[in-house]
Curated annotation (Swiss-Prot):
Enzyme class, spelled out: translocase
PANTHER family: SPERMIDINE/PUTRESCINE IMPORT ATP-BINDING PROTEIN POTA, SPERMIDINE_PUTRESCINE IMPORT ATP-BINDING PROTEIN POTA
Chief localization: membrane
Record note on quaternary structure: The complex is composed of two ATP-binding proteins (PotA), two transmembrane proteins (PotB and PotC) and a solute-binding protein (PotD).
UniProt cross-references to InterPro entries, sorted A to Z: AAA+_ATPase, ABC_SmlMolc_Importer, ABC_transporter-like_ATP-bd, ABC_transporter-like_CS, Mo/tungstate-bd_C_term_dom, P-loop_NTPase, PotA-like, PotA_ATP-bd
GO molecular-function term, one example from the UniProt record: ATP hydrolysis activity
Enzyme Commission number: 7.6.2.11
UniProt-recorded name of the protein: Spermidine/putrescine import ATP-binding protein PotA
Occurrences of domain ABC transporter (ranges): 18-248
Gene: potA
Protein family per UniProt: Belongs to the ABC transporter superfamily. Spermidine/putrescine importer (TC 3.A.1.11.1) family.
Binding site for ATP: 50-57
Keywords tagged on the record: ATP-binding, Cell inner membrane, Cell membrane, Membrane, Nucleotide-binding, Translocase, Transport
Length: 378
């Protein structure tokens, strides 16, 4: 965040594959997508991220042709597919349920789409075998779905989707049914497979960590509109508003009031009652309310004892959570606000494992903060 962690925002030379222009969609008179514009580039892994009901799955279904738009246009490879039936789009979808045929073998499940397309019989076996080899299931070709684990079923669904060589693969929360460890493994496998195939993936999830792990680009949605579109690092370190900041990982929000502008970058402000310099890249006036945002890992804490005087926000440790590599502390400021602090665990530091009710000073590296206008006092 800020100056010390400046992002590399070099433009990427990617060509557009899908263009959504002015897309609107309503169900039962309720608008779920509103004037949405989105470009999806060739060969990228793009994630639509947002809470339940934000419209992300509807966008996926509109691209797939499983729903029709009320307004706007969808282009695929410079062709208008707005009103093209789903079966005639070079787009395949992997659903949350995988939708495998229980009475068919793995081989026949993967071959199903090829047979429906009337692919020559001589081509089917080698293409299915290649697809199963890609997802490391070649030896499971004659098994039925019920004989496979959840992760293996997921890979069958992906093999069935890619065997048709689609231009675009859509995945609708397709990892959510897996347990935590298997989901982490599949995240890595899915990203590696996407790089190997070179197919554009559009992935829908409400899991922020999943989006950060897998994506080249994340589109954060709320109430049918795009709140922010950027790389995982941009979304995490440079949130554009309080919703994005709060939705992507843990973040602390401090109330601030402008005292005066010092120069083009810095403002003197009172942050939770403490005067300090903050980096503000927009026009402000004395007395204006601001939000200062800091991730738990960007905060520094130091114990205050009788014999030392330390600058910072003063508070007291109320909770401690040991998480292996990190120690998370909840610190209550003197004004009652709760602050989350995350530190890498250091067993060699005798002062590291803070005791409950220990008096602490909280500070941060100047310019690591993200500053936003106070949305409540605009």
């Amino acid at each position: 965040m800020g100056q010390s962690k400046k992002l590399n925002n070099q433009p990427r030379s990617l060509s557009p594959l899908v263009l959504l222009s002015g897309i609107s969609k309503s169900f039962d008179g309720k608008e779920v997508i509103s004037q949405l514009d989105l470009t999806i580039n060739n060969g990228e892994f793009l994630t639509l991220l947002g809470p339940s009901g934000c419209g992300k799955t509807t966008v996926l279904r509109l691209i797939a042709g499983l729903e029709t738009v009320d307004a706007g246009h969808i282009m695929l490879d410079n062709q208008d597919i707005t009103h093209v039936p789903a079966e005639n789009r070079y787009v395949n979808t992997v659903f949350q349920s995988y939708a495998l045929f229980p009475h068919m073998t793995v081989f026949e499940n993967v071959a199903f789409g090829l047979r429906m397309q009337k692919t020559p019989a001589a081509e089917i076996a080698p293409r299915v075998t290649d697809a199963l080899r890609m997802v490391q299931l070649e030896e499971f070709a004659q098994r039925k779905p019920h004989q496979l684990s959840g992760g293996q079923q997921q890979r069958v669904a992906i093999a069935r989707a890619v065997v048709n060589k689609p231009r675009l693969l859509l995945l609708d929360e397709s990892l959510s049914a897996l347990d935590y460890k298997l989901r982490k493994q599949m995240q890595n496998e899915l990203k590696a497979l996407q790089r190997k195939l070179g197919i554009t993936f559009v992935f829908v999830t409400h899991d922020q960590e999943e989006a950060l792990t897998m994506s080249d680009r994340i589109v954060v949605m709320r109430n049918g509109v795009i709140e922010q579109d950027g790389t995982p690092r941009e979304i995490y370190e440079e949130p554009k508003n309080l919703f994005v900041a709060g939705f992507i990982g843990e973040i602390n929000r401090f109330d601030a009031t402008v005292i005066e502008r010092l120069d083009e970058q810095r403002v003197r402000a009172s942050v939770e009652g403490r005067e300090c310099n903050i980096y503000v890249n927009f026009a402000v006036e004395p007395g204006q309310k601001l939000n200062v945002l800091l991730r738990p890992e960007d905060l520094r804490v130091e114990e205050i004892n009788d014999d030392n005087h330390i600058e910072g926000l003063i508070g007291y440790v109320r909770e401690r959570n040991y998480k292996g590599m990190t120690l998370e502390s909840v610190v209550e400021l003197e004004n009652g606000k709760m602050v989350m602090v995350s530190e890498f665990f250091n067993e060699d530091d005798p002062d590291f494992d803070h005791s409950l009710d220990q008096k602490m000073a909280i500070s941060w590296v100047e310019s690591w903060e993200v500053v936003l206008a106070d949305e409540e006092h605009k």
